[in-house]
Design a protein with these regions (language model features):
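Short, solvent-exposed loop/turn segments at secondary-structure junctions
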Residues: 19-24, 94, 137-139, 146-147, ...
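Bilobed periplasmic-binding protein-like "clamshell/Venus-flytrap" ligand-binding domains
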Residues: 110, 219, 300-313
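A structural signal for well-ordered alpha-helical segments within the folded catalytic domains
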Residues: 2, 100-103, 107-114, 156-157, ...
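C-terminal, low-complexity/hydrophilic appendages and adjacent surface loops
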Residues: 154-155, 223-285, 314-316
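Residue-level signal for well-ordered alpha-helical scaffold segments within enzymatic catalytic domains
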Residues: 3, 7, 111, 115-119, ...
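Polar, surface-exposed loop/tail segments
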Residues: 2, 13, 126-132, 171-245, ...
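Active-site-proximal cap/lid insertion segments
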Residues: 4-128, 132-178, 191-199, 291
């Protein structure tokens, strides 16, 4: 990446730099930098999501059995996943060590990003280069008793987003609200004065970056289309998990920080992220939330029409 920047500094370019880390197996440099016993954890750490969807409960049962029930480590399921993670998830300190190794992965990525930024400065193009830093997904890391992604929980679906547009502002600002990755391409095209193709589903966030608009009315939608039946068991766990992961999910996060996750074949989920940021209490079956659920579900259906999405939704 640094070489590419140097070789192309005299002409317009777009450079996409992707890293495998942080990702299982969570190994790499800086493995001993973080003390597992001092790694911060929240109230959802190694706590099964008893009121959540069946797929989340089954996944938690699968991962937590290693610690709580002492499953024979020679079983096929365990052997596949243990080999993939290369971590001891049979004890709490093992889970904490896994989190420490994940942080080590992030530190490695931070160093890499620093080198790319330095290459931009060395090339003399810092003042006319847009830099975007984000991530495809997060990782459960033991929260709600799970690992990796494949969940609508915040740990898996909420990611960092940093956008540097030097000609807009030299000042660092935190913009309150939520946005979607699908908005990045329209935003970048708008920032460089290029037309936005009509087939793109996202919208430009340039007015937000310029301070002309906020995100107070910005719903964010997250979709999971389900795994194809041909996907092998490795990394997914037991056969029951694979079956449940084939079901599509549609989720909305509203500006007032409520999250509704809908699936036609599973227990749906509703969380008040203001008062329950760790998503410990699923309010979907709370009678007091019927009107809210109906409103949020209708927004998902409008989004489906706009995007020509045909995933089945439950009756709400």
């Amino acid at each position: 990446a640094c070489q590419f920047i140097d070789e192309n500094k005299d002409r317009p370019f777009i450079l996409y730099v992707s890293t495998f880390e942080p990702h299982s197996p969570y190994h790499g440099p800086f493995m001993d930098q973080y003390d597992p016993e001092k790694i911060p954890v929240g109230p959802a750490f190694l706590k099964k999501p008893d009121t959540a969807s069946l797929v989340n409960r089954v996944r938690a049962d699968y991962f937590m059995q290693f610690m709580l029930d002492g499953v024979d480590q020679t079983t096929d399921d365990y052997a596949m996943n243990y080999a993939a993670y290369r971590e001891d998830i049979t004890t709490e300190i093992g889970w904490r060590t896994l989190r420490a190794h994940y942080l080590a992965n992030i530190t490695s990525v931070d160093r890499m990003v620093g080198k790319v930024n330095q290459a931009i400065k060395d090339a003399g193009i810092e003042d006319n280069t847009i830099v975007v830093f984000t991530s495809e997904h997060g990782d459960m890391l033991g929260d709600h008793g799970m690992l990796e992604k494949r969940s609508m929980f915040e740990e898996a679906s909420r990611v960092p987003l940093v956008i540097k547009v030097p000609w807009l502002s030299k000042k660092q600002n935190i913009i309150e609200g939520s946005v979607s990755h699908i908005d990045l391409v329209p935003t970048l095209l708008d920032l460089i004065g290029e037309p936005i193709p009509g087939h793109l589903q996202g919208k430009s966030l340039k007015p937000v970056l310029e301070g002309e608009k906020d995100l107070s009315d910005n719903d964010v939608f997250v979709s999971w289309n389900g795994y194809d039946s041909a996907v092998p068991d490795r990394f997914l766990g037991a056969h029951e998990i694979n079956r449940m992961l084939r079901l599509p999910w549609r989720t909305i996060i509203t500006p007032d920080r409520w999250k509704l996750a809908l699936c036609a074949g599973d227990q749906c989920e509703l969380y008040d992220l203001n008062n329950d940021p760790y998503e410990m209490e699923n309010l979907f079956n709370n009678p007091e939330q019927k009107d809210r659920i109906r409103d949020m579900a209708s927004r998902i259906r409008v989004w489906q029409v706009d995007t020509k999405d045909n995933a089945p939704l439950p009756t709400t």
